[in-house]
From Swiss-Prot:
Disulphide connectivity of cysteines: none
Role played: Catalyzes the formation of 2-amino-5-formylamino-6-ribofuranosylamino-4(3H)-pyrimidinone ribonucleotide monophosphate and inorganic phosphate from GTP. Also has an independent pyrophosphate phosphohydrolase activity.
Biological source species: Sulfurisphaera tokodaii (strain DSM 16993 / JCM 10545 / NBRC 100140 / 7)
InterPro entries, alphabetized: GTP_CycHdrlase_3, Rev_trsase/Diguanyl_cyclase
E.C. designation(s): 3.5.4.29
Catalytic reaction equation(s): GTP + 3 H2O = 2-amino-5-formylamino-6-(5-phospho-D-ribosylamino)pyrimidin-4(3H)-one + 2 phosphate + 2 H(+)
Gene: gch3
A matching Pfam family: GCH_III
Similarity comment text for this entry: Belongs to the archaeal-type GTP cyclohydrolase family.
GO molecular function list: GTP binding; GTP cyclohydrolase IIa activity
Protein name: GTP cyclohydrolase III
């Protein structure tokens, strides 16, 4: 599987240069920057995952790597600090992240893999009366999914609200179904696509099917071609 890692160089030093009354400025930049990164990624059928606001992972399977210069130009226009990138390829997304290198040759020659996204949707979340109790419940589930995804070499990502995604290779489909069955109050839409955006779209369609028929809690939508 393939990734590009985008790092903001000397980001901490830049935040400290904003003065003491800076936290609102930092938050404003971080959310705005991520919003634009998501738009750029969507243009090339990719998706952005981040666990910290000075480093981002762009999923590249099924994405035209030749658009690299376009991506970098766009990102550099948005960033207040220099950008450093590396490319990773491996059997799993975790392997790809750990094999990250500035050399593009290996990733250009590597085969594109299909992308699997399991979109977990917690039942009854919106009916919970207390905000913090609801958040704590989602956080506990996210922590479990994060650790399980890591064991399989995948990445878990919190989409917001009661929605959590796991990104993996398609060879993990049976393990994902087994995991989904271990949560009694969870709908799980599994999308398989030729690129990250397509896989996410298929996962959303799978959830829609679950909501319509109400006789299942797991559904799979696969782009066969």
């Amino acid at each position: 599987m393939k990734i590009m890692q985008i790092n903001l160089v000397d980001y901490k030093e830049w935040t400290e240069s904003l003065g003491y009354d800076r936290e609102w400025k930092i938050q404003n930049f971080q959310h705005g920057f991520l919003s634009r990164l998501n738009e750029i990624a969507a243009e090339i059928n990719s998706f952005i995952i981040t666990y910290r606001y000075d480093s981002y992972i762009m999923l590249l399977d099924g994405v035209l790597i030749g658009k690299n210069d376009y991506i970098l130009t766009k990102i550099k226009e948005l960033s207040p600090v220099p950008i450093d990138i590396c490319f990773g390829y491996g059997k799993t997304l975790l392997d790809a992240e750990r094999n990250c290198s500035i050399n593009m040759d290996n990733i250009l020659l590597a085969k594109d893999e299909k992308v699997l996204v399991a979109h977990f949707d917690l039942d009854g979340f919106s009916r919970k009366r207390f905000l913090f109790d609801a958040y704590l419940e989602v956080y506990k589930i996210y922590n479990k999914l994060f650790n399980y995804a890591m064991e399989l070499g995948g990445l878990a990502y919190y989409f917001g609200g009661d929605n959590i995604g796991i990104f993996l290779g398609v060879d993990n489909i049976n393990k994902v179904i087994e995991l989904a069955n271990s949560f009694p109050n969870m709908k799980v839409g599994i999308g398989i696509g030729n690129n990250p955006r397509e896989a996410l779209k298929n996962a959303a369609e799978a959830l829609h099917i679950i909501r319509i028929y109400r006789d299942r809690k797991i559904e799979i939508v696969d782009s066969k071609n």
